[in-house]
Amino acid sequence: MNAQQAQREHVLAVSRDFISQPRLTYKTVSGVNGPLVILDEVKFPKFAEIVQLRLADGTVRSGQVLEVSGSKAVVQVFEGTSGIDAKNTLCEFTGDILRTPVSEDMLGRVFNGSGKPIDKGPPILAEDFLDIQGQPINPWSRIYPEEMIQTGISAIDVMNSIARGQKIPIFSAAGLPHNEIAAQICRQAGLVKLPGKSVLDDHTDNFAIVFAAMGVNMETARFFKQDFEENGSMENVCLFLNLANDPTIERIITPRLALTAAEFLAYQCEKHVLVILTDMSSYAEALREVSAAREEVPGRRGFPGYMYTDLATIYERAGRVEGRNGSITQIPILTMPNDDITHPIPDLTGYITEGQIYVDRQLHNRQIYPPVNVLPSLSRLMKSAIGEGMTRKDHSDVSNQLYACYAIGKDVQAMKAVVGEEALTPDDLLYLEFLTKFEKNFISQGNYENRTVFESLDIGWQLLRIFPKEMLKRIPASILAEFYPRDSRH
């Protein structure tokens, strides 16, 4: 397609969505309150309508109608309200909702939090303009996620297996290496390659990453961009960056723009998309700021009462759809304020998502990477993504036994601090030995170490051989007979 044809297609796409009503312009700003602009004497304002605000110096900002009361309209300005002059600001009501241009050309590009290119490249030639709230997916047409994604990280693959189409957050805290873990998952993620069985859609053309950053510092944005460039996957990555010095309110639309792009890539281009959203805590704080400006009744810790619903509108945009080959797997990252898992943000997130990966400060302080604490971590869809034909028949039993031994080992460690090592039984000493080796050999691994799920399971068996057969009560006798002997090579 040459440039002229492309331009013609672009014009057709725009005119297809053209709203025929005349656009009305007002100069009736009656007040500015935080990120909100209040307009009077507006004829038929519509909820969620997009408004273009032209400032006295000629700059144009966009906003969205949040509230309508008679002829009054409350507009949330995405780029912030600094410099808006009540007398000289022109407000044009577009009569349309917020749509974003989408195209396969978005891969390899960098956008700001409002979806404008910031990589000095040309604007996107839109294949379509999609509503950023997403298409409602009929629950009946959703497919249960059943293909395991191999991340190459033992603590995730064996203990908290992720299925393609799952939403699973990383619960972290300030100063912990959650970005490194997310980058490692992006680098290494792929389907499990079973011996003697080829994976049809495993080729890299079929895989895309959509990365949305909200309120992150320049260092984090640079880290991810550099990591994608270094491992050669940048042409399959679409970045949306709202940095810490960008407007707070923009953070409310950034994840929605990213997910709209992901839905297009997954359901129209049939790609398998991995969506990384960081940092959801910044998003929730932006939500609180808007809520406070609207003088709504606050909920827990000042967050709005509808935060649960709002977070669900983001997290639920993951999964698989009948008749389409693509999928969306979501890994939101959130930093728990003061390492508090009962804080409203991680608390509500845990209710919506299908498990969580818990990054632990104590493990990090002991120089263990990745510091994933497997006890509070969970993957609710693991049971259907593992087992014979998908990974290996001993997978769930090994996982259960490792959990049990690690939990008992933690109890023994706490007891040892009280009564001393001399008072422990021989069995207790075995659990202590297991605890140390589990953290050192199983959880701990290199930044670029990509273990297959079979290698990880074999490491698990090496650790379980610390115990005599009789103590491994979670594993059936048939599995023990096959895998427990030292000379078994599977």
Swiss-Prot record:
- Name the CDD domains for this protein: ATP-synt_V_A-type_beta_C (cd18112), ATP-synt_V_A-type_beta_N (cd18118), V_A-ATPase_B (cd01135)
What are the annotated disulfide bridges? none
Q: SUPFAM superfamilies, from UniProt?
A: P-loop containing nucleoside triphosphate hydrolases
Under Pfam families, the record lists:
ATP-synt_ab (PF00006), ATP-synt_ab_N (PF02874), ATP-synt_VA_C (PF22919)
Residues of the signal sequence?
A: none
Q: Which UniProt keywords apply?
A: ATP-binding, Hydrogen ion transport, Ion transport, Nucleotide-binding, Transport
Classify the source by domain of life: Eukaryota
Q: Name one GO cellular component term.
A: brush border
UniProt-annotated binding residues for ATP = 380
Tissue pattern of expression reads: Expressed in Malpighian tubules, rectum, antennal palps and oviduct.
| One GO term of the biological process aspect | proton transmembrane transport
Q: Which effects follow disruption of this gene?
A: RNAi-mediated knockdown in the wing results in planar cell polarity (PCP) defects including misorientation of hairs, multiple wing hairs and defective venation.
GO MF, one annotated term: ATP binding
Keyword Nucleotide-binding attached: yes
Assembly description: V-ATPase is a heteromultimeric enzyme made up of two complexes: the ATP-hydrolytic V1 complex and the proton translocation V0 complex. The V1 complex consists of three catalytic AB heterodimers that form a heterohexamer, three peripheral stalks each consisting of EG heterodimers, one central rotor including subunits D and F, and the regulatory subunits C and H. The proton translocation complex V0 consists of the proton transport subunit a, a ring of proteolipid subunits c9c'', rotary subunit d, subunits e and f, and the accessory subunits VhaAC45 and ATP6AP2.
> What HAMAP family does the entry give?
ATP_synth_B_arch
State the function annotated in the UniProt record: Non-catalytic subunit of the V1 complex of vacuolar(H+)-ATPase (V-ATPase), a multisubunit enzyme composed of a peripheral complex (V1) that hydrolyzes ATP and a membrane integral complex (V0) that translocates protons. V-ATPase is responsible for acidifying and maintaining the pH of intracellular compartments and in some cell types, is targeted to the plasma membrane, where it is responsible for acidifying the extracellular environment. Essential for the proper assembly and activity of V-ATPase.
Q: Which family does it belong to?
A: Belongs to the ATPase alpha/beta chains family.
For this entry, the protein name equals V-type proton ATPase subunit B
Organism (species)? Drosophila melanogaster (Fruit fly)
